[in-house]
């Protein structure tokens, strides 16, 4: 099993967006911002341990940071990783309903 300290570092925050809201309602899928070095097994274990739900599958994607301009200088935002966590039938997490209020 993963150490408790690592579990807390894997998941950073739920990712709330229009697409994430649709996935949560339609496909029982929750989207999280996760650590760049986290793998699918760690993400699944972290969600199961911290939220006490059963995970069906995990898909991950690295979102590349945008190039932004700050006056005359060019800068770049950091890359980050998000994970689409699909829960088993009958399981639910309600981050989206709490954010809508």
Curated annotation (Swiss-Prot):
PROSITE patterns: RIBOSOMAL_L23. GO terms for molecular function: rRNA binding; structural constituent of ribosome. Keywords: Ribonucleoprotein, Ribosomal protein, RNA-binding, rRNA-binding. GO terms for biological process: translation. The keyword Mitochondrion does not apply. It comes from the Bacteria. Signal peptide: none annotated. GO terms for cellular component: ribonucleoprotein complex; ribosome. Pfam families: Ribosomal_L23 (PF00276). HAMAP family: Ribosomal_uL23_B. Belongs to the universal ribosomal protein uL23 family. Part of the 50S ribosomal subunit. Contacts protein L29, and trigger factor when it is bound to the ribosome. One of the early assembly proteins it binds 23S rRNA. One of the proteins that surrounds the polypeptide exit tunnel on the outside of the ribosome. Forms the main docking site for trigger factor binding to the ribosome. This is Large ribosomal subunit protein uL23. It comes from Haemophilus ducreyi (strain 35000HP / ATCC 700724).
